């Protein structure tokens, strides 16, 4: 009797062990199916790209006058405020130009005063004392002197403007970058001396494949993961480019269309720039030109909750294709 119960117990234990293995196997298979489905949905349903660039408004700063650089007051990658002096150009030369222009104005003012007095005197005497030709000559001389005075005043205004332009100031708050001029160098008018990356002007340009544009609309939310980072930032689709360059629509020397010879069964999807407005500016944490992965999640509102380990893993995988 004892052996019977022992045998029955062993059979039940074996059955329980077998059922446990089956259950564990089913759970593992189910988890694998769920994981595969999430990966598939993550890669196919949500429009995404790993070809996205942080971008900012950049001002190419070039002087409006030529001359020697006498004072460079900023360093490369320095944060400056609007109106801060960046560099100063040879002011003594332009001070001399202003002084000369002021002297010319004073001369022509005196000349106009003299010609006006002479013209008035002759007009009062009239044709009884002199010929009409002499009166006309006096009036013409006054008119000529008046025009010369106006020209001298314009030259003086331009000289003062150029003197003011010898001090180059920051047009906005931002970071000075690619500074490649030094004191003592001669700088030409119109030649870019430095670039200014505007503060609080950062946005993202995501280059989406044309096959994914149906899921991209103005106002849709987007998740942004900088390359090599686990942080996720959020933004909103601002606009989609209205057109891109058509490389097949070029003309040869005779004006005929030049069509690329593409294989019919190989069609590469074109990439279209999508501008994404960031929810918050990050300063210079991610410089303009650095790369990020973007997922357009649709109309739902994102929050700053930490993503699951699986989602973080998928973001990592996307960085490698």
Curated annotation (Swiss-Prot):
Subcellular compartments: Cell inner membrane
GO cellular component: plasma membrane
GO MF assignments: transmembrane transporter activity
Gene3D superfamilies recorded: 2.40.30.170, 2.40.50.100, Helix hairpin bin (1.10.287.470)
Protein topology in the membrane: Single-pass membrane protein
Similarity comment text for this entry: Belongs to the membrane fusion protein (MFP) (TC 8.A.1) family.
Annotated protein name in UniProt: p-hydroxybenzoic acid efflux pump subunit AaeA
Origin species: Pectobacterium atrosepticum (strain SCRI 1043 / ATCC BAA-672)
């Amino acid at each position: 009797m004892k052996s019977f119960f022992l045998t029955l117990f062993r059979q039940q234990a074996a059955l329980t062990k077998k059922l446990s293995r089956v259950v564990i196997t089913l759970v593992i298979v189910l988890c694998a199916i769920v994981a595969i489905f999430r990966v598939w949905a993550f890669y196919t349903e949500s429009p995404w790209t790993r070809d996205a660039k942080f971008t900012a408004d950049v001002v190419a700063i070039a002087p409006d006058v030529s001359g020697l650089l006498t004072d460079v007051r900023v360093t490369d990658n320095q944060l400056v405020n609007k109106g801060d002096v960046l560099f100063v150009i040879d002011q003594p030369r332009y001070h001399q130009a202003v002084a000369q222009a002021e002297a010319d104005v004073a001369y022509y003012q005196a000349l106009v005063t003299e010609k006006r007095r002479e013209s008035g005197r002759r007009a009062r005497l009239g044709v009884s004392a002199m010929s009409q030709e002499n009166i006309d000559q006096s009036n013409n001389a006054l008119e000529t002197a008046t025009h010369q005075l106006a020209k001298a005043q314009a030259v003086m205004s331009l000289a003062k403007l150029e003197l003011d332009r010898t001090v180059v100031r920051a047009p906005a708050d931002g970071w000075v970058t690619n500074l490649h001029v030094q004191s003592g160098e001669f700088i030409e008018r119109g030649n870019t001396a430095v670039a200014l990356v505007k503060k609080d002007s950062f946005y993202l340009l995501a280059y989406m494949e044309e096959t994914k544009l149906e899921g991209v609309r103005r106002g849709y939310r987007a998740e942004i993961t900088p390359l090599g980072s686990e942080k996720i930032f959020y933004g909103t689709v601002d606009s989609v480019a209205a057109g891109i360059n058509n490389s097949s629509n070029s003309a040869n020397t005779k004006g005929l269309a030049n069509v690329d010879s593409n294989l019919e069964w190989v069609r590469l999807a074109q990439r279209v720039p999508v501008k994404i407005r960031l929810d918050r500016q990050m300063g210079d944490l991610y410089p303009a030109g650095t790369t990020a992965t973007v997922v357009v999640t649709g109309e739902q509102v994102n929050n700053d909750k930490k993503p699951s380990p699986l989602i973080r893993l998928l973001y990592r995988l996307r960085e490698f294709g």
